[in-house]
């Protein structure tokens, strides 16, 4: 197999994973407020779940990126799927507020684990001659997935909410198979920032009242 073919396969795998994950994530998130209202829950309850959901999904990447650098991207990708799939299945199985909240927190946690990994893979598999193109394609795929997911979920939830959630579970399951069979571990730097320092950075971020308030407000009004 030629080096060019290897690179092309790696890029296709990375983009497929990102497209499927954005489909799974936004397919659930964009319709979640409608779903919760259909079950009779209030906007205040929606705000609580969304605040915690965004809190996890935007802070966990700091830690998951460090784990990927230290233990390998493929292992952390699989960990994300193992958090994602049971959470979506729980969302299918429960109608209680506590159950739905737990499912969404786990989905936010899983999305946070996944979030930096494909961007990190693109960074490690490109160089100064093609990095701009690589990231341009990457973010185009992010936008396609973010648009495609809600459209598909919207069509499916017109039949049943279960079908909409199942489409996300299927997408993550396909990601699992693609990762096991085709994902190639990118070369990693020999110098890895200590996990303890990353955790201290998170605590420093959380101590910023303005930033924490922003996350809460984002959840309430998203």
Question: Where are the regions a protein language model picked out?
Answer:
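Glycine-rich segments within core transmembrane alpha-helices of 12-TM secondary carriers
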Residues: 132-151, 157
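Symmetry-related core transmembrane helices of the 12-TM Major Facilitator Superfamily/SLC fold
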Residues: 163-181
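Flexible cytoplasmic inter-helical loops of multi-pass small-molecule transporters
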Residues: 183-201
